[in-house]
Every structure is written in C-alpha cells, then in structure tokens.
Amino acid sequence: MSGDASTPEQDPAQVVADGQQPVETPNDPVETPSASDPGSAAEVSPQTGNNEARLEQLEREHTTLRDEHDVLRGQYMRIAADFDNFRKRQSRDQDDLKIQLTCSTLSEILPVVDNFERARQQLDPQGEEAQALHRSYQGLYKQLVDVLKQLGVAPMRVVGQEFDPTLHEAVLREPSDAHPEDVVIEELQRGYHLNGKVLRHAMVKVSMGPGPQDGASSQPAEAPAADAPAEDSGSGDGNG
C-alpha cells in the first residue's frame, strides 16, 4: 500500500550530487581557525594595532592631564599662600589701628590723671566738709586708675633708674653727689606703659654726677679753660 510504504534513506553523496546542502549532524567536527593560518593572523593584527594606538593616546592624555594638574595645583598653592598673607596682614593692620585709637584716646585722658595726682599732693583739706570732698575726689581718681589698669595701662617707676631715651625725656640735668651720672633723680611727669609699650614718656630730671669740689660753679669743667688766655696775657705783661 502506498500509505504504509516507507521512504528509502537518501545517500548524502546523492544529495550533494542533486545540488542539495548536506545536513550537519551533531557529531560533525567544528572547524576552528589555526593560529598558523595566515588568514586568521591578518584578521587579528589590525585589532592589536588599534589597541596599541589607543593605549598610546591614553598615555598622552594622562601625561597632559597630569601636567595640567601640577600647574593648577601650583597656582592653587600660590593663591592660598597669598590669601593667608593677606588675612594675616589685615589682622595685623586691624590690631595696629586698634592700638593707635586706644593710645590716642588714653593720651587725652592722662592729663586728667595728672591733675588728680597734683591735687592729691598739694591739697591739705581742713575741716570735715573739705575732707569729705577730698575723699570724693580720691574715689573718682581710684576708679579712673582702675579703668586704666584694666585697659593695660601701667605707670613707670623711673627714680633711681638709669636714663633711657626710649622711656624717659630729660627735661633738666643737674649735678648730684648722691647719684652717679645719667641716673634719674626726679620724676617731673609720670610716664605710662600700655601692654608693655610706651604710651607716654616720663619727663625726668637727670643727674650729671658730682659737681665741682669747691661748689663755686655747677657747670662742667669748661670754665678753667676760659681762664687760660688771661694767665698767658698776665705772664706776657710781666715779661714786658
């Protein structure tokens, strides 16, 4: 019967001969390109060249970026140093301005302190009312001195000290048997420090050392030199 007849198997060679493609079976070996195959080497070589070129390009870009980083870092360091110096200079200028304003203000107050000092030394209040008024002035003076002390103002102690032009202003000089030369023997106006710096120089009287033995003159020894021509003149007259 035609329906039950099985189709005979076709020979692969016959199939190829008839122009049909052979059917691959799972057991057929897979052809792989050989490393020694010139065709495969030709396919790999361009890819390797592209990778090397890309690597060289990346290395150049890395070098360029590293150089730019070094330049920018140097600029940043200079800008940071300049800003730090500017900040320090501004802070120093502000401190100097503050000190100048403080010194200017305190210099206007010091004459008031001088007046209190003179009043305390000269006044001799008599009677209960005068003494009460004197105590009131002394209380004001003490408050003023305390405020100055809180601001960093301190009086100089100059009597008996060696004369120092950076601290003292010599108003008078006189001979003194009790003090050697260039020693302060009297304070004429008190000097003050402000936080260790001179706020006002002290006006002082300075010793010139012991005077002449006969006490006839307080001038240095220029006077005997003035008498020398007179002695020469007298001897000349005697010879004549």
From Swiss-Prot:
Q: Please give the residue ranges the record annotates as the region Disordered.
A: 1-54, 206-240
The Gene Ontology terms for molecular function here are: adenyl-nucleotide exchange factor activity; protein homodimerization activity; protein-folding chaperone binding; unfolded protein binding
Matching entries from Pfam families are given as: GrpE
Cellular component terms (Gene Ontology): cytoplasm
* Subcellular localization, as worded in the UniProt entry: Cytoplasm
Disulfide pairs?
A: none
Out of the domains of life, which is the source?
Answer: Bacteria
Q: Subunit comment for this entry?
A: Homodimer.
Q: What does this protein do?
A: Participates actively in the response to hyperosmotic and heat shock by preventing the aggregation of stress-denatured proteins, in association with DnaK and GrpE. It is the nucleotide exchange factor for DnaK and may function as a thermosensor. Unfolded proteins bind initially to DnaJ; upon interaction with the DnaJ-bound protein, DnaK hydrolyzes its bound ATP, resulting in the formation of a stable complex. GrpE releases ADP from DnaK; ATP binding to DnaK triggers the release of the substrate protein, thus completing the reaction cycle.
Stated name of the protein: Protein GrpE
Organism name:
Synechococcus sp. (strain WH7803)
Designated gene of the protein: grpE
